[in-house]
Amino acid sequence: MERIISELEMPNEIEIQKSLRPKSFDEYIGQENLKEKMSISIKAAQKRNMVVDHILLYGPPGLGKTTLAGVIANEMKANLKITSGPILEKAGDLAAILTSLEENDILFIDEIHRLNSTVEEILYPAMEDGELDIIIGKGPSAKSIRIELPPFTLIGATTRAGLLSAPLRDRFGVSHKMEYYNENEIKSIIIRGAKILGVKINEDGAIEISKRSRGTPRIANRLLKRVRDYCEIKGNGTIDKLSAKNALDMLGVDSNGLDDLDRNIINSIIENYDGGPVGIETLSLLLGEDRRTLEEVYEPYLVKIGFLKRTNRGRVVTSKAYQHFKKVEVKI
């Protein structure tokens, strides 16, 4: 079932999300510290007539890692090639991409933490020395051939930086953490998106959507489209505070951007374990959700807004969450 506040990209929204992506740093809203550092790196590289150092972008999904890779490519006037860790199953898969690169190309590998070790080892000499070692043949007759690669930049993206091996992580010259966006930045993203989509919206309407967007541009753009649909049918076509509130309430997204699944996680810990602590494996079984999905997709936002704590003994619901859900906290 579609989860409207999922940070993950849905297949049916890929094209429209592309249309909303900024093309330059001037259009890119938020991540100011990161933008300044990257802008300096790019200008310095251009001044020296060199490629930018390899870049690692990490942070929760939906914050614009792919978008930023596109912006960097545009600023460098470079071609961008996109792939992902799970797709590159064999060393030959990555070798084929590397040998197709042209000078100054940018290779973007999403979910780079999911590369298997055999594929990952191909990257080491490619990143460090601009060389690709290929084994031709098998057994005693096998030969190693070294191919010189043109200068290129690798941009790796991950939601789990801690899962990267040290040898791979150390080969990135630049490493940046993508931060959640504040409400004002999200509001600006919504107003920009509305303009591109031809949607009428006032500032109060944009603020109401931004408060429920979980600090994530991908979610903000998705909610904007849903509220637009609601206003076209049940409103006057213009998104204001009341129409945005009514639409999002109907969609089950509350004032903190929480949905039924978030509420189920918190309520399950409260009702079954008096608020915790409860181990992640137990919680996974209780909710019928994969452990990795809980850790990577569901928990980060609950932790960010102070509703859930990760402790050595397990997950614990906070007093702030009890107040939000109007539950009576059990003191032990």
UniProtKB/Swiss-Prot annotation:
Gene3D superfamilies: 1.10.8.60, P-loop containing nucleotide triphosphate hydrolases, Winged helix-like DNA-binding domain superfamily/Winged helix DNA-binding domain. Homohexamer. Forms an RuvA(8)-RuvB(12)-Holliday junction (HJ) complex. HJ DNA is sandwiched between 2 RuvA tetramers; dsDNA enters through RuvA and exits via RuvB. An RuvB hexamer assembles on each DNA strand where it exits the tetramer. Each RuvB hexamer is contacted by two RuvA subunits (via domain III) on 2 adjacent RuvB subunits; this complex drives branch migration. In the full resolvosome a probable DNA-RuvA(4)-RuvB(12)-RuvC(2) complex forms which resolves the HJ. The RuvA-RuvB-RuvC complex processes Holliday junction (HJ) DNA during genetic recombination and DNA repair, while the RuvA-RuvB complex plays an important role in the rescue of blocked DNA replication forks via replication fork reversal (RFR). RuvA specifically binds to HJ cruciform DNA, conferring on it an open structure. The RuvB hexamer acts as an ATP-dependent pump, pulling dsDNA into and through the RuvAB complex. RuvB forms 2 homohexamers on either side of HJ DNA bound by 1 or 2 RuvA tetramers; 4 subunits per hexamer contact DNA at a time. SUPFAM superfamilies: P-loop containing nucleoside triphosphate hydrolases, Winged helix' DNA-binding domain. The lineage of its organism: Bacteria, Fusobacteriati, Fusobacteriota, Fusobacteriia, Fusobacteriales. One of its GO terms (cellular component) is cytoplasm. Residues 255-332 are annotated as: Head domain (RuvB-H). Mg(2+) binds at T66. Coiled coil: none annotated. It comes from the Bacteria. Residues 182-252 are annotated as: Small ATPAse domain (RuvB-S). This is Holliday junction branch migration complex subunit RuvB.
